[in-house]
């Protein structure tokens, strides 16, 4: 078993990177990949950079060069579900773009031409994540995570997302691109992120203040998940 782990920002990968044993670093095309072992699992940890293009590029490099069996996307997200607060966990059952629109040609909102309307996370990985959440006694919500190249910080964009994707539980900037590439490669994936803000007018202030909290929570869960995967 080899696990690929993806975070966009330094703060989202540093806690995991520091615990990788026999760590080696590969830098390519603006991405950094750290390989070694963590909690008994061979890992390749990617720091992709922010946004959909960086995430897609990095995920492609990760899958081509390291050939992981599964991909775990970690980091922070803006909460949309009413029950979520800072530090809570969101687990994807599927991911969609919130900023793709080819509805003029009969596609669903958020669906890219020639692609599925949503990219489905792997059910076995979801089950494993939920077992780890229960063991850690974390508050989590499972559902749709939406992605786009915008930090949601205001009433109008937030209302648009809520109206277009009323079932969405969280919003961020990379997960759907990661899911898209994993779909193309046939690699199972899951998104496991922690809430840093609630995507409102104060989200930029909340994000800066609580990113470390979100990174700690999501990294804790990823470590637990790796230990679970190591047991088979």
Curated annotation (Swiss-Prot):
EC number assigned by the record: 3.2.2.9
Binding residues for substrate: 78, 152, 173-174
Record's catalysed reaction(s): S-adenosyl-L-homocysteine + H2O = S-(5-deoxy-D-ribos-5-yl)-L-homocysteine + adenine; S-methyl-5'-thioadenosine + H2O = 5-(methylsulfanyl)-D-ribose + adenine; 5'-deoxyadenosine + H2O = 5-deoxy-D-ribose + adenine
GO cellular-component term (any): cytosol
Keyword Oxidoreductase tagged: no
A family per Pfam: PNP_UDP_1
Single biological process term from Gene Ontology: purine deoxyribonucleoside catabolic process
Metabolic or biological pathway: Amino-acid biosynthesis; L-methionine biosynthesis via salvage pathway; S-methyl-5-thio-alpha-D-ribose 1-phosphate from S-methyl-5'-thioadenosine (hydrolase route): step 1/2
Gene3D superfamilies for the chain: Nucleoside phosphorylase domain
The entry's keywords: Amino-acid biosynthesis, Hydrolase, Methionine biosynthesis
SUPFAM superfamilies for this protein: Purine and uridine phosphorylases
Single Gene Ontology MF annotation: methylthioadenosine nucleosidase activity
Signal sequence, start to end: none
Listed CDD domains: MTAN
Catalytic center residues: 12, 197
Listed PANTHER family: 5'-METHYLTHIOADENOSINE/S-ADENOSYLHOMOCYSTEINE NUCLEOSIDASE, 5'-METHYLTHIOADENOSINE_S-ADENOSYLHOMOCYSTEINE NUCLEOSIDASE
Family to which this protein belongs: Belongs to the PNP/UDP phosphorylase family. MtnN subfamily.
Function: Catalyzes the irreversible cleavage of the glycosidic bond in both 5'-methylthioadenosine (MTA) and S-adenosylhomocysteine (SAH/AdoHcy) to adenine and the corresponding thioribose, 5'-methylthioribose and S-ribosylhomocysteine, respectively. Also cleaves 5'-deoxyadenosine, a toxic by-product of radical S-adenosylmethionine (SAM) enzymes, into 5-deoxyribose and adenine. Thus, is required for in vivo function of the radical SAM enzymes biotin synthase and lipoic acid synthase, that are inhibited by 5'-deoxyadenosine accumulation.
Database matches in NCBIfam families: MTA_SAH-Nsdase, PRK05584.1
Name this protein carries in UniProt: 5'-methylthioadenosine/S-adenosylhomocysteine nucleosidase
Organism this protein belongs to: Erwinia tasmaniensis (strain DSM 17950 / CFBP 7177 / CIP 109463 / NCPPB 4357 / Et1/99)
Originating gene: mtnN
């Amino acid at each position: 078993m080899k696990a690929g782990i993806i975070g966009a920002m330094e703060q989202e990968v540093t806690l995991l990177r520091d615990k990788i044993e026999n760590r080696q670093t590969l830098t390519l095309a603006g991405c950094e990949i750290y390989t070694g072992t963590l909690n008994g699992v061979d890992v390749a940890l990617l720091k992709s950079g922010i946004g959909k293009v960086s995430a897609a590029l990095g995920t492609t490099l990760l899958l081509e060069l390291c050939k992981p069996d599964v991909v775990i996307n970690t980091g922070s997200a803006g909460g949309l579900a009413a029950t979520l607060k800072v530090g809570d966990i969101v687990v994807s059952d599927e991911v969609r773009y919130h900023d793709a629109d080819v509805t003029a040609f009969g596609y669903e909102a958020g669906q890219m031409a020639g692609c599925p309307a949503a990219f489905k996370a792997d059910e076995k990985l979801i089950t494993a994540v939920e077992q780890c959440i229960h063991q850690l006694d974390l508050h989590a919500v499972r559902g749709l995570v939406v992605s786009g190249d915008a930090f949601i910080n205001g009433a109008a964009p937030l209302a648009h997302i809520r109206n277009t994707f009323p079932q969405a539980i969280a919003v961020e900037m990379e997960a759907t691109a990661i899911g898209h590439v994993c779909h193309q490669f046939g690699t199972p994936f899951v998104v496991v992120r922690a809430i840093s803000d609630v995507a409102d007018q104060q989200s930029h202030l909340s994000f800066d203040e609580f990113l470390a909290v979100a990174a700690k929570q999501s990294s804790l869960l990823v470590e637990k998940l790796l230990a679970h995967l190591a047991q088979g």
